Amino acid sequence: MPVALTEEQTALAAAVRDWAAAHDPVAAVRAAETTGAGLPEGFAALGLTGVALPASVNGADGTVADLAAGLAAAAEALVPGPLLSTALAGLLLAEHSKELAAEIADGTAHVAVQLDEEAVPGADAGSWLLVPRGERYVLVPPGAAVEPLAPFDFSRSLGRVKADVPGEVLDLPDVRDLAATLAVAEAAGVARWCLTTAVEYAKVREQFGQVIGAFQAVKHLCAEMLCRTEAAEALAWDAASAVGDPLAVASAAAVALDAAVENAKDCIQVLGGIGFTWEHEAHLYLRRALALRQWLGGSQRWRKRAADLALAGKRRTLGVNVGEDAEVTRLVAEIAALPEENRRTALADSGLLAPHWPQPYGRGADAAEQLRIDAALTAADIKRPDMVIGGWAVPTILAHGTDEQRERFAAPTLRGEVTWCQLFSEPGAGSDLASLRTAARRTDGGWLLTGQKVWTSLAHEADWAICLARTDPDVPKHKGITYFLVDMRAAGITTRPLREITGRSVFNEVFLDDVFVPDADVVGEPGAGWKLARTTLANERVALGRGSAVGENVEELLESAPEDVDRDRLGALIGQGSACSVLDLRATLRRLDGLGPGAESSVAKLLGVRHRQETAEFALDLASELVAETPAAQEFLLTRCLSIAGGTTQVLLSAAAERVLGLPR
């Protein structure tokens, strides 16, 4: 999902793209190889530098988030010139120099902003300058002594500013944070162009008789680029929306600056030889990404800043204001007054336990109502019980089962009277469910199931199982599969616990030896099990975490981190955790707008798994002793399953490349 979310932001980004399509900004960048390019003629008419400035200085009275959306689109098109620094200066000077701010808004003035390096992007003889002097900044009019330099990034001029240039001294707080807020939007735009370019090339470039996008290695490169792009865009949007929040911008810069650089490098890799040529523009985007990162002092600086802020107690929470529901508030208050042991039944009977389920078992709640219910439960300190596999099984029964099956299983599952396991995976069919071999043959009044299932969580204590078995071996493998409900106490079932690397036994292998399943326990039509299984795997409610934006696992790290903790590594985890939280938020906003899951959903598991595994490993590294039963050791071992269960990371990378990016199978 791009940085632009609102209709206004989307329209602004589209206007920038339309302008770029008509004016070929890349050609202007190429033409300025030795001098660096200025803002192209005619671009000022778009008014981008004045988008977030007040009407009192001829601005558009928009937000910094609006400006970020435009900057991301401009960077995606490689619009040259000091657009970023001029827009930054406009925000900084709107209350200090209204005349100059008005010139910035109408595009007649451009400004270069110095942060650390003597070489200043955008500085030339005609530019205004903002240069640091101690804790303050000096505003220098055009004509100051600026030594022109040959820029690494051709899309902007580069100049060395003479020390102690005279000018107006100003108190400008948070210059660097505001600069980073806008720069990460540009970084997100660069990352998006690199992803798009690599994917489009992979769809048409042929090698060994097929397009290279069909090769797993290329798919995984592109899928990793997708993950970086989505994280960068989400964090750029968040930093701009929460402008002034130092942890938001530090987290964004910790992730997005590197995302742009890594995507540019991987884009060249996918392009191969053509990507290494001067004629292809990929290197121009790599130059822009590297220049952005250097201008802000490198991403390590921002990882350390994120860690410093978090260790000092700075926190953020993310949320969506969907209002309150008086009836829900009343119901929740009544449930909160009950003894703990009675609350689950009350939640189930009121429809609050699974509000997204249809009535009478749920409330048929839309996304907004689900969030209002969650907020009310959180405020009352009521934790919703986890139905585990029941939360997947029952929605399939509700959608495809009989009235008798719904009556028999839905309410008892909600109340905790029936627990479930899932008999899907087999020794030869893990993620590839269509290859399962468990057979079901017809008998009087039902079916006899024979086969072996594995990796079945909680099978040793579950009451019922949802089970896939092959009822017709003579049709293509995705067909001929039927969806059964299996009583785990039935004759012919043998359950054997599997000891995991944690030393515990949660997984099991289950042997089925002529297990009788009556026709009344078949869900849907025989042979339609594949479609129903996909329904099971897709069922999820709308939810939004209400804790710290950096994530629960990072919070535990922060509580126990020693004074000499590796702040670069900690800051990276804070950035990752923030990315996961913001992706979750943006996915929720999509659902509130009535849209289906976007790329965020595909990316969220990939990033979330990696984040939790790396956080667990860091916690283990911080442990004073490597003792087997410590929480850190157990969590590290447990998290190794996350990149396997529910689809391995490698399978999910391929799926993201095919289903989100459109690369061929």
Please provide the spans of the model-predicted regions.
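A short, Trp-centered hydrophobic/proline-enriched beta-strand micro-motif
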Residues: V29, D106-D116, V131, G416-F424, ...
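Internal helix-loop-helix
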Residues: A44-A101, L352-A411, R415-G416, L458, ...
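Extended, hydrophobic interaction surfaces within ordered domains
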Residues: A188, L195, F208-G313, P631
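Glycine-rich beta->alpha junctions and the first turn(s) of the following alpha-helix
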Residues: P2-A14, D18, V146-E230, G319-G323, ...
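Glycine-rich phosphate/cofactor-binding loops in nucleotide/flavin-utilizing enzymes
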Residues: P2, L88, I274-A337, A368, ...
